[in-house]
Curated annotation (Swiss-Prot):
Its EC number is 4.2.99.-. GO terms for cellular component: outer membrane-bounded periplasmic space. The gene is vgb. It comes from Bordetella pertussis (strain Tohama I / ATCC BAA-589 / NCTC 13251). This is Virginiamycin B lyase. Gene3D superfamilies: YVTN repeat-like/Quinoprotein amine dehydrogenase. Keywords: Antibiotic resistance, Lyase, Magnesium, Metal-binding. The keyword Metal-binding applies.
Length: 299
């Protein structure tokens, strides 16, 4: 692959805990400030906008582009899902049951958003009009974390404390699939073009592949302490991920070949990751910047 250029764009302060990032079709990047209690937008021309949230400590975390092209996000402490319009109009949807701590969120094939309830042992589904349904999981204390839409029409999720992943749809009951490593602690999950699921295993420093036949292949990274966190798939068949514990952005091909890109500042703490419409990779650094990785021609 071509060489990679990395460019940082300061969008917040370290104490605001920049966490999630998502791209919308207009080329904008939206991000969450978990301790800054705000959602931000980086426009294609580099302008930064902020949208304060009404809760004193809502803890916005994961963010995604919804079926309507707008950013949707979870507020773990406020027990809600939010949506923003480009002009800053905010809608908040409180979850039916208290203290559910919603975290991961992803758009589904059914035109709805699906989200994981870490403390509720449930998966939620919300229409773009705000109607919410919840589905109890058969595993208690599993800590459902991140979500992804599979090529099979199902929604897939990680169970961080259960060392497993699961699938669900509005018409299919949840199914649970244990991963190979007891200490996997899966967080991020993404689907590739072949229908396989890729999982970031923060506990043992590995990326796992779960194919359509249910086979699990584990790819150890350079260090068990790398703590891979979020995952995103690009159009070329690569999976990109943040290495929270190693201060790197990683890449793995569908064949399992890996590469890593060191971040410029020590202790950047990369978390969320997204691919923009031009194929550039963006990651959210807790130190307050979005970093863009883009291919450059070889010398």
């Amino acid at each position: 692959m071509n060489q990679v250029e990395m460019t940082e764009f300061p969008v917040g302060k370290p104490e605001e805990a920049l966490y999630g990032v998502a791209s919308t079709p207009d080329g904008a990047l939206w991000f969450t400030l978990a301790k800054g209690n705000a959602i931000g937008r980086l426009s294609p021309d580099g302008e930064v906008s902020r949208f304060p949230l009404p809760h004193a400590d809502g803890q916005p975390t994961t963010i995604t582009c919804g079926p309507d092209g707008r950013p949707w996000f979870t507020l773990s402490s406020a027990n809600a899902v939010g949506r923003l319009s480009p002009d800053g109009a905010l809608r908040m949807f409180e979850l039916p049951r208290p203290a559910s701590r919603p975290f991961g969120i992803a758009a589904g094939h059914d035109g709805c958003l699906w989200f994981a309830e870490m403390a509720g042992d449930r998966i939620g589904r919300i229409t773009i009009d705000g109607d919410i349904e919840e589905y109890d999981l058969p595993v208690k204390g599993g800590y459902p974390s991140c979500m992804a839409a599979g090529r099979d029409g199902l929604m897939w999720f990680t169970l961080n404390q259960a060392g497993a992943i699961g699938s669900i749809s509005a018409t299919a009951a949840p199914r649970i699939f244990p991963l190979g490593a007891a200490d996997a602690a899966p967080v991020g999950i993404a689907s590739d073009a072949q229908g396989a699921l890729w999982i970031a295993q923060a506990g043992n420093g590995a990326i796992a592949r779960f194919d359509a036949g249910g086979r699990i292949t584990e790819f150890p990274l350079h260090s068990r302490a790398a703590r891979p966190h979020a995952l995103a798939a690009d159009a070329a068949g690569n999976l990109w991920f943040t290495e929270w514990g190693a201060n790197r952005i990683g890449r793995i091909s569908e064949a399992g070949d890996t590469a890593g890109y060191e971040l410029a500042a020590p202790g950047s703490e990369p978390h969320g990751i997204a691919i923009d419409p031009h194929g550039c990779v963006w990651a959210a650094l807790e130190t307050g910047s979005l970093v863009r990785l883009q291919a450059s021609p070889r010398d």
